[in-house]
Design a protein with these regions (language model features):
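Conserved alpha/beta core of the MobA/IspD/sugar-nucleotide pyrophosphorylase nucleotidyltransferase superfamily
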Residues: 199, 203-257
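Intrinsically disordered, low-complexity terminal tails and inter-domain linkers enriched
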Residues: 1-19, 43-69, 136-139
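N-terminal nucleotide-binding beta1-loop-alpha1 segment
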Residues: 8, 16-42
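Acidic donor-binding segment of Leloir-type glycosyltransferases
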Residues: 91-113
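Short phosphate-binding loop-to-helix
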Residues: 106-142, 200-203
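Conserved donor-nucleotide/metal-binding helix-loop-beta segment in metal-dependent transferases, i.e.
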Residues: 155-177
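Short, glycine-/small-residue-rich phosphate/pyrophosphate-handling segment
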Residues: 182-209
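A short, N-terminal amphipathic alpha-helix
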Residues: 72-91
């Protein structure tokens, strides 16, 4: 379990280790509580009638009938993130930590291993729990915490980052602003030690995690604001997120084309 024995050795800095496999841990909030600020900002700047009311049931699955717009966007982003991670040859499994039933049902059908947020004590506790389960399931694989809102994520960029991460006991990728963290990795036998929150890039670096260097625009672009969505749309949104935004904020997507 990753919360246990620490690695006695260090990977040679800057050296990508061939054949390293990874378990990806993705935390997903309860959909009704996710992306509320993003949706509020979109409502103020685009078509607030669609962002504050559910679209006709004919254009979405019946299970989503009562899900607010913010929840539909959050679920779509999680779907695209999971699909991108699963497309990487070095990813052994994807573990989703969530207490949301719809998210669990949807993401499990994509092949993710879904576990409840048993600690129920915030993001870092959920990630520690998921990392422990992932390590128990695949003790031969390193563990990666990955943001659930990387809707434009390209598998090639994630693969490249994971290859670099294989050269460091712990490593991280900062977000586009350079202050947050979108990816945190730990090799087998090393404590993941997630410290997400305010200024997490600085905090992770101070904790000993190595900052990974690479352009990786889709890996660094988590989606918290309409401006983030516009940039992600230019990069190319995943199918699920693009479909939701075509319904909820078509003007934003069309402006990015």
């Amino acid at each position: 379990m990753l919360g246990g024995v620490m690695s006695s050795g260090r990977a040679k800095p800057g050296t990508a280790l061939a054949g390293v496999m990874w378990s990806i841990v993705i935390p997903v909030k309860r959909l009704s509580l996710a992306k509320t600020r993003l949706c509020a900002a979109l409502a103020a700047s685009t078509r607030d009638d669609l962002l504050t009311h559910s679209p006709p049931s004919a254009v979405r699955p019946a299970a989503e009938d009562q899900l607010p717009a913010n929840g539909r966007i959050a679920l779509a982003m999680a779907i695209d993130t999971v699909c991108a991670a699963q497309a990487c040859a070095s990813v052994a499994c994807v573990v989703v930590v969530t207490d949301d039933r719809l998210a669990a049902d949807t993401l499990s059908t994509l092949g993710a291993r879904v576990v409840p947020d048993a600690p129920d004590d915030g993001l870092n506790a959920a990630l520690r729990y998921g990392a422990g389960l992932a390590a128990a399931h695949r003790p031969d694989a390193g563990v990666v915490a990955l943001s659930a809102d990387l809707a434009a994520l390209r598998p090639g960029e994630l693969t490249d980052a994971l290859e670099q991460a294989a050269g460091h006991a712990r490593a991280f990728v900062s977000d586009a602003q350079g202050t947050g963290t979108t990816l945190l990795s730990a090799l087998t036998g090393t404590d993941l030690d997630p410290r997400f929150g305010a200024e997490s890039a600085r905090v992770h670096r101070r904790s000993g995690a190595h900052p990974l260097e690479g352009g990786w625009p889709s890996l660094r672009r988590d989606l918290d604001t309409p401006a983030d969505l516009t940039v992600a749309a230019r990069l190319g949104l995943g199918r699920a997120t693009a479909g939701q935004l075509a319904l909820l904020a078509p003007d934003l997507v069309s402006c990015a084309c």
